[in-house]
Amino acid sequence: EVSSIAMSGFYGQSFLERANYKDLVQDCLHAMKVMNAKVAFLPLGGIKAGWEKIPALRTEVVKRLKEVGDMAASEGVVIGIETQLDAKGDVKLLKEINSPGIKIYFKFQNALENGRDLCKELKILGKKRICQIHCTDTDGVTLPYNERLDMNKVKKTLDKMGWSGWLVVERSRDKDDVRNVKKNYGTNIKYLKEVFQ
């Protein structure tokens, strides 16, 4: 089973500036069909910071996300977007997009790095707006040793919300042993299973 297909090229390239964005998303939708994945991951990190405050740029982002969201919805799948906005900003953006094919792919790291209350952010978004979660933080320590991420509190919050789904481990590597993939991911997965299962 495949959790999601990532369009990670959009971390480095701007979804706003690519003329062929629909073709790129369509390629992802084809891959999803082949892999039987129900979620695509679309990070908006490649867009120049501050786009959400410039009306012309925001309008174009909303238009493009509505188009690709409707493409996804017509195939019975969802595109999960990652933004740097807070939860209220994400809710507002989703309302503007107004497509059942666009939801939030929530990343713990964004809330934590910006000093936001992670559990409060989850509650504001609510279970219906979150398609998947990057259960990860900045590299430094693995999840069991992360002092700013209370995973038990996160579990209680998600349970209270009634949310269930994929928790995708992306980073949270030991900074002194970042290349040891087996150790880092093995440690994180073991810990998540202890907390969530």
Kindly label every feature range from the protein language model:
Residues 3-5, 40, 133, 167:
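Hydrophobic residues within beta-strands of alpha/beta enzymes
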Residues 4, 11-104, 111-113, 183:
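Active-site acidic/histidine proton-transfer and metal-coordination neighborhood
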Residues 74, 87-197:
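Histidine-acidic metal/acid-base catalytic patches
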